[in-house]
Design a protein with these regions (language model features):
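Membrane-embedded alpha-helical bundles of polytopic integral membrane proteins
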Residues: 2-186
């Protein structure tokens, strides 16, 4: 078996397991969707902060930034499902203010960069993953009752997966020269 075939098999098995977890988490129960995306938000924010903190003169508070991201995800879930009022976002905003103000007193070499990387984690990871709840919970106009529609976020992910898979296959079969060598796989 060649290295390319082995790589394809590993990608396929990983992809099938990932899709199974995502479909199970999105399609059946709202609690599963909320838990799945809170977990994904927490893990990706934690990983992002770890990568950013490896840079010289950058120090992002990994724990509080991750906790804020997970809280934002859960706050969106509660608000969109109709369980909590809009005031549920106030603790998140206070946490963001804390992260900004605390940076002034930590005497870091470049606090503006630390702010930028902290806010980027919230805008690049936490906010988009929290928006899944906006798609999943819909209110019906006549009675205003909120209902869970897991098919909508699932369809968005299916479109993304199909597009990504098609791009990978086209690039593997047709492409001989990488358009962007720094970001192209393999």
């Amino acid at each position: 078996m060649t290295e390319k075939q082995s790589n394809l098999i590993v990608r396929t098995v990983t992809g099938v397991l990932f899709v199974a977890v995502m479909v199970t988490g999105m399609a059946f129960r709202p609690e599963a969707l909320i838990l799945l995306f809170a977990l994904i938000t927490g893990l990706t924010t934690w990983e992002y902060c770890g990568i950013v903190n490896q840079r010289e003169d950058i120090s992002v508070n990994r724990f509080i930034t991750t906790a804020a991201a997970v809280y934002l995800n859960l706050a969106f879930a509660g608000y969109c499902s109709g369980v909590t009022p809009p005031a549920v976002f106030i603790p998140y905003l206070l946490t963001i203010v804390y992260l900004l103000v605390a940076e002034l007193y930590l005497k870091q070499p470049n606090p503006v960069n630390d702010w930028a990387y902290t806010m980027l984690s919230q805008l690049y990871i936490a906010l988009p993953l929290s928006m899944v709840h906006v798609l999943a919970f819909m209110s019906t106009p006549p009675d205003g009752e909120v209902r869970f529609v897991g098919l909508v976020p699932l369809s968005v992910f299916v479109f993304l997966w199909v597009n990504d898979t098609g791009a990978y296959c086209a690039g593997s079969l047709l492409g001989r020269h990488k358009l962007f060598p720094r970001v192209s796989p393999g």
